[in-house]
Regions:
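A beta-rich soluble binding module of mature secreted/lumenal proteins
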Residues: 2-186
């Protein structure tokens, strides 16, 4: 009987260890789609502040959200505080999520990892930005995540077109982007 318990305990221990190792490996790297090249040099201080989401690949954490903004500020430890906010047009309620971003490598490269759920990080890669840091194209860790961001609630058509071409060249299907309503009525 004791041998059976020992085997079970050992199996559970090895399973937990395996899961922890996978979590550590996943959280230590920032991934991005093949062909996506991050902005370098990147000025994190110029990137801080409020950004409006113009378009995105839809996923469960942003489902049914309009008026989406992201606000970036520096934490005391040098990481970046991320506050995402959006209005759920189905429930008629504001939703907010606070997370933390860290550089995946050198601080002058726009390859970051962001977490809203404890030790679990996802890739956040600025792959295009204008010289004045007014418009940005952000790739996630796979072709399932993409954002077009602007410092204002609109983006000029020529910038949109350039960013869409850039995303398509990497392999993104941009026909299913959600174009976010930015309205003052909420």
């Amino acid at each position: 009987m004791a041998t059976c318990r020992n085997r079970t305990a050992r199996w559970i221990g090895l399973t937990i260890l395996g899961v922890l190792v996978l979590m550590i490996i996943k959280s230590c790297k920032s991934s991005r789609p093949d062909g996506a090249v991050v902005v370098k040099p990147f000025d994190a201080d110029k990137y801080l502040g409020k950004w409006y989401e113009i378009a995105r690949k839809d996923f469960k954490h942003e489902k049914n959200l309009n008026n989406v903004t992201a606000n970036y500020s520096k934490n005391a430890d040098g990481s970046i505080k991320v506050v995402n906010k959006g209005f759920n047009y189905k429930t008629k309620e504001w939703q907010e999520a606070t997370g933390k971003a860290k550089f995946a490598g050198a601080p002058d490269e726009a390859s970051l990892k962001v977490s809203f759920f404890g030790p679990f990080y996802s890739g956040y890669n600025v792959i295009a930005i204008d010289p004045d840091y007014q418009y940005a194209l952000v790739a996630g860790e796979s072709l399932d995540y993409l954002w077009l961001l602007s410092r204002t609630s609109t983006m000029p058509e020529d910038v949109k077109d350039d960013y869409l071409r850039c995303a398509q060249a990497i392999g993104y299907n941009t026909s299913d982007l959600v174009w976010v309503e930015q309205s003052s009525k909420y």
